Amino acid sequence: VRNSTSKNSVIVTTLLSALFFCFILVLGSLSPLADSGPNVNTFGSTGLWLSLGMVLFLYLLPLAFYMLGMHFLKFVMAAFCSIGLLIAASTLLLIPALFLFGLEDFSGNLASIIGIMISCLGLLITNIVWFVAAFKRPSATVQESV
């Protein structure tokens, strides 16, 4: 029972993590950050769709094989999860710094910036929960009953 519950938790948190990451990409393309350089995705562009496709591919391919019983892919997903943690944490620190130091003008699109911050916070929390779900050791009572 524990293994099935753990596997379901990993699946659900992986899907939530993918959703939050996609939200960050889409909301970022709607924000003033989309005008910050020549290589930034703008909303509806081919680059945005390719980015979303790549993110979903990198999330869903290892997850599909994990669901088929290849549990060693949990470590590959952990590497991607770590990258997601790094991106979420750095974005949560970078956006307020840009605002405080006056390097970016967020006045017209505050809603998209707040959406990015909420999505980053959701990604951060979801990825931490993912690590707990994926690598939690069974409790002593469960071990005794087995």
Q: PLM features: what roles do these ranges have?
A:
Residues 57-68, 128-133:
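Alpha-helical transmembrane segments in multipass membrane proteins, preferentially the mid-helix core
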Residues 53, 79-82, 118-121:
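Hydrophobic residues within alpha-helical transmembrane segments
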Residues 15-57:
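Hydrophobic transmembrane helix segments
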Residues 62-86:
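Loop-to-transmembrane helix junctions at the membrane interface
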Residues 33-49, 90-118:
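Interfacial non-cytosolic loop connecting adjacent transmembrane helices
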Residues 29-37, 67, 71, 96-104, ...:
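Transmembrane helix-loop junctions in multipass membrane proteins, especially transporters and channels
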Residues 1-29, 132-146:
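Cytosolic juxtamembrane helix and N-cap/initiation of the first transmembrane helix
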Residues 13-14, 101-137:
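Alpha-helical membrane-associated segments of multi-pass integral membrane proteins
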